[in-house]
Structures are given as structure tokens and as C-alpha cells.
Amino acid sequence: MIYDSIVIGAGHAGVEAALILAKKHNTLLITGSLKQVASLPCNPSIGGPAKGVVVREIDALGGVMAKAADLAQIQIKMLNSSKGPAVRALRAQIDKLEYPQIIFEILQKTLNLTLLEGLVNNLVIQNNQVQGVCLIDGTKINAKTVIITTGTYLASQILIGDTKKSSGPNGVPTTYGISTQLKELGFEVIRLKTGTPPRVKKNSIDYSQTKIQMGDNLEQIFSFVPQTNQRPQEPCFLTHTNQTTHQVIQKHLNQSAMYGGYVEGTGPRYCPSIEDKVVRFCDKNSHQIFIEPESLSLDEMYLQGLSTSMPQHVQHEILKTIPGLQNAQITKYAYAIEYDAFNPNQLKHSLETKKIQNLFLAGQMNGTSGYEEAACQGLMAGINASLKLQNKPPFVLKRNEAYIGVLIDDLITKGAKEPYRLLTSRAEFRLLLRHDNADLRLKDYGYQLGLIDEKDYNNFQNKKAKINLLLEKSKNYEILVNSDNLSYLKQQKSASLGEKTTLAQLLKRPELNFCTLQHFLQEKADKTIYEQVEIQIKYEGYIAKAQKEAQKLARLEQKKIPSKINYADIKNLSKEAQEKLDLIKPQTLGQATRILGVNQVDISILLVYLEKHHALL
């Protein structure tokens, strides 16, 4: 039997890829452990700045992460709610036992999808085209396309102090064959590191020495299709390290796997270990530690901010210095994990490899960190593998269309030498890439690709129509200077009116919000629809400016660079630019502008060359 596609690895990337492919194709999902499908080994949360928006983008394109997160969340909060809409995002505490179970049940019910527990030893490749896989027991399985989503399980090692153990997270076996094979085929393999903090017993914490952190009372969800989850929100708690903590860490610094020279891999810049924080930010007297629930079914709390690779006895010593954790009982020790990954500049924007046809890479093995970054790559790899099977062109999101587009373009164009984390600051057009409008940006694509069902799409069309109706009414609704309106504005602590105005003009006042729309229009509509109308009116000028800038970028993206161009032939192009352009092989002039080592002079020279030799190329 020949499968249309094989997905290797059932983490967050593999799950999204397999579910997308199975909508149209016969798909095999291979995992080292069916008990660890979509597991949360690093932290029990989904979302955060930029990442929460990605979860909504995944949902708008037909992915599953948002729906499962809504069902499994035990606390949810809108971050940056007091700031502008460009930086708002949801973050949820997730029940680490319930979430994988929800995903596993979805996989089991999915038609065209076969689940197989096993380890892949190597790929079957002929004439630079993948043909299938071989398992470690010698079984050969043929497929037309293959997606590798092995996360942190390639040649992985667990490190605690000076001890090393060959293993993936949660005791799942590591694998070496794929990494070795791709290295032999000329792929650049990079060594990366991440880590996780200790877990402690709930009832061993003195919560009176901590500050409680509650979720939002208002109902918040990731998915645009509401899921039922009526349970109460679980609290988190905040404590801090102190100078005594830092003295303990400094005293034992050379015993850390990181500072003792036992780690080869590069760690994440934006999620450093506690020993890294103490060394890098030595002027700070304390660091935050969030105490978070891992599951309603576990007597265990996660200590966010205390990731470390210190020996076990030092971990105990560290906890004894932290308020509320002096008597905490460790249920699972912190550790670092290093693993093989692949520099993503070896991929096309479709996430297909440049060297091997029909082979796609997605997730943490592409040098990213985070469940959300992995899931969106799996989704896009699944979509593009499906399109390849249908002989259709790839689907590539632009930087002004989605954070997913920003992430993939950054990876392909700039590569990765350390774990890449998506940040709002990485997006030039973050006012366009908001939490609230992910469906307005992407759901049409999802429907066109056959990933959104008719009922969902009809509901979306009705939502769009309602938004447009309220926008039009707001622009035409006249606010007269009368006692009722003046009294209302006074109640809202807003300036009086000197002459009549429109509701849209009135709403541009910073102290007024969607409640003003509801007060005057009296239209029946969800709060989210009113909020969308408010944002589009209040930030109209800024949004128009961002759209104008995006159009400028689009013009550069339309200038294609022939694949057969020889950069060595271009006179006056710097040596570094020649090397970088030849390595990345940008498809457009816009992409070339974002390559590190290619400056504006190089771009001007390249543009002149392309215009002069266009007919010959």
C-alpha cells in the first residue's frame, strides 16, 4: 500500500499536518508513543503575546489547536488588555492530561488517517525525491509525500547537572537515523537546547507568601467556533527569587549543565534558565516565578521562570530560598534537553526542502520554540503537501496577512542559530495582524482550500455582513446636540458637543468604546462584533497607513528573481551578499531585502541587474 502522505511525529506540528492531510488524502501518522500524542512536556500553557494570535490563525485555517485549548483550559486571560489591539493576545493554562486526550480522540475519529506507534530509522529517497520511510524493525512504508515533525526527539539528550541521558521528553526514546541521513545528504544540522523547571506538590506550597493571579472573569476563547467549557477558573500564584537565591545559584554555577560545559546546543534567548538570568541580568535583585496548575487531575504545580539544569540537590537548595516554596516537595526535577534541528533556510516557503522533493519539515526541528509555532508550521506543511499531491501551487501567507507568514518568512530568509520565538515586534504590520481579526484575514483562504465546512463559513459570512452593517450605520448615524446625548457624554466623562457629529466620529474619542455603539445603535449583535467595529473606526487612520506600507512591500514581492540566476555574475554585488543570496535563493526582491548581510546598496544593484537582464533570464 502507498500512502498519499506520511507524517513522522505526533506533537503539535504533526497533529495539525495529519488532520489537514486526512481531509483529502490517505495519511499515516507515525509516533514513538501513542500515549504522548500532542503532549505538553515543556509548560502547561498555550498562547501569549503573538503566539495567542497564531492559535486563532490556525483556527481560521481549519486547524484544531484552538478548539482543543478551549476545551482543556483551566484558566484564560487576555494579555495587554489595557493596551492597544495590536498587542493583545490570549494565554491559557491548559490541563496537560486533558488536552492530549482531546486531540487523540479527534485523531481516532478522523477518516483517512491511520495511527502507528513506531520509530522511523530512515527515509526512502530516490533521485532526490522521497518515496517513503523505513522503521527500525525494517518495515518499509511507501508514500508520495513525507512530513517530518520530530520536535526535540532527534538525537536528544536530557541533562541534569553533569549527568546526560539519551532520551526525549517524558521518557520517549530518541532517534538518530533521520538526523544522520539528512546530514549525509548535505543538510545543515544545528544543535539546540531548551529546558523546563521543576514541578512541586500543590499542598507543599505556602500560598500565604505568594500573590494570587486569577484569570479573566469575562468569557474568553481562542476558537471562532465556541466550545463548551463551563468549569471555574483555577488560580495561579506569583512569587520571586531574591538575593539569597542568586547567591545559591552563583555558588553552584559550575555544576549547571549549561555553565559546566556539558551543553553543546544553543538555548532560547527569550526563555532563559534561572542561572542564565542571574548571570545575564546581574543587576536585578529578583525574578518572577509563576506557580501554575498542570492539571485538575494532578497534585502538581509548574514553576514558570525557574527552568534550570542544576543538579537535583541544588534544585532543592534553590527552592528553600524562595517565599512560599521553602518546604515545596519536588515531584519532577528540572532538566535541560538538547537536540538536533535543521537550519530552516534549507526550506522553501511551502516548508518543502530545497534538496529533496516532496519532503517537508515542520515544527521545533526547524529551529523554533513553542507549541504554537510548531502547530502553525505543521498546518502549513500539511496544506502544502496536500496541494503538491493535487498538482496545485503552494499556499504561502504574506507578512502582512498573518503572524504565520511572518514566522515562516523569518525562518526561510534569516535561518536560525538559536530557538526562534515569535514576538509582536517581529511583525512590521502588527496592527493588521490582530487577535480580533484573524478570521477576517484568513477564513476565506481556509474555505477556498476546503478546510472550513459550509456551516462555519456561513456563520462567518453573517458575521462579516453584520460588521459592515454596523460600520455603515455608525458613519451615517447623527448624534444631535440635545439634553439626552449631552447627559450621556457627561456620564462617560467625555467632552460636550458643540455641533452635531456622526457616531463614528464620536467613537474616535479615546474614553469611549463599543458600549457607546450599543447605546446608540441598539442592534442585536455579539460583543465581539461591536468590538470589531470599534477597532476599525478608532484606528482607521493607523490601519490605512499600515495597509499603504504593506502595498509598498507587495510591489517588491511582485519582482520575481529567476531561480537560475548566478549572483557571481552581478558586478559590484558584495561578496557577502553573493554568498547569502546564493544560499537562501530568494524568490522575490522583497524577500532578498530581509536577508541578513544583504544591504540596501546590494538590493539596488540587484534591481538594476534584474531590470537590465530580465528578458535574458
Swiss-Prot record:
SMART domains: GIDA_assoc_3. This is tRNA uridine 5-carboxymethylaminomethyl modification enzyme MnmG. Belongs to the MnmG family. It comes from the Bacteria. It comes from Onion yellows phytoplasma (strain OY-M). NAD-binding protein involved in the addition of a carboxymethylaminomethyl (cmnm) group at the wobble position (U34) of certain tRNAs, forming tRNA-cmnm(5)s(2)U34. InterPro entries: FAD/NAD-bd_sf, GIDA_C_N, MnmG, MnmG-rel, MnmG-rel_CS, MnmG_C, MnmG_C_subdom, MnmG_C_subdom_sf. NCBIfam families: mnmG_gidA. Homodimer. Heterotetramer of two MnmE and two MnmG subunits. One of its GO terms (molecular function) is flavin adenine dinucleotide binding. PROSITE patterns: GIDA_1, GIDA_2. The keyword Cell membrane does not apply. GO terms for cellular component: cytosol. One of its GO terms (biological process) is tRNA wobble uridine modification. FAD binds at residues 9-14, 120, 175, 364. The gene is mnmG. Its cofactor is FAD.
